[in-house]
């Protein structure tokens, strides 16, 4: 089960997300995560409209299945998803 405390150790694909702070204002978007790489998150914002957001310099707000919202700095997510799941993070 995904919780606020273990979100960074789970897959983001399928979660609702909004990008609240980014260097490019046109990338302030809200949608569903459909893919993730080491440096980017791909979001489906409308039907069949996909946007690629750089992780570095962005702030993401993920909505968990329970309805809770979690804000995460994209700079700490800039590692491969499969490595992030295994990595231990310091409490923030």
Swiss-Prot record:
This is Ribonuclease P protein component 1. GO terms for biological process: rRNA processing; tRNA 5'-leader removal. NCBIfam families: RNaseP1Mthb (NF046110). SUPFAM superfamilies: Rof/RNase P subunit-like. Belongs to the eukaryotic/archaeal RNase P protein component 1 family. The keyword Nucleotide-binding does not apply. Consists of a catalytic RNA component and at least 4-5 protein subunits. It is found in: Cytoplasm. Its main location: cytoplasm. It comes from Methanobrevibacter smithii (strain ATCC 35061 / DSM 861 / OCM 144 / PS). The lineage of its organism: Archaea, Methanobacteriati, Methanobacteriota, Methanomada group, Methanobacteria. Its EC number is 3.1.26.5. Keywords: Cytoplasm, Endonuclease, Hydrolase, Nuclease, tRNA processing. One of its GO terms (cellular component) is ribonuclease P complex. It is an enzyme of class 3 (hydrolase). Pfam families: RNase_P-MRP_p29 (PF01868). Part of ribonuclease P, a protein complex that generates mature tRNA molecules by cleaving their 5'-ends. It catalyses: Endonucleolytic cleavage of RNA, removing 5'-extranucleotides from tRNA precursor. PANTHER family: RIBONUCLEASE P PROTEIN SUBUNIT P29, RIBONUCLEASE P SUBUNIT P29. GO terms for molecular function: ribonuclease P activity; ribonuclease P RNA binding. Gene3D superfamilies: Ribonuclease P/MRP, subunit p29.
């Amino acid at each position: 089960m995904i919780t606020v405390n273990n979100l960074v150790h789970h897959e983001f694909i399928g979660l609702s997300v909004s990008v609240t702070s980014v260097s490019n204002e046109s990338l302030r978007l809200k949608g569903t995560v459909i893919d993730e790489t080491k440096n980017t998150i791909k979001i489906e914002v409308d039907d069949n409209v996909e946007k690629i957001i750089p992780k570095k310099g962005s702030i993401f707000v993920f909505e968990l299945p329970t309805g809770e919202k979690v804000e995460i700095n994209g700079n700490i997510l800039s590692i491969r998803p499969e490595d992030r799941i295994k990595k231990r993070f310091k409490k923030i």
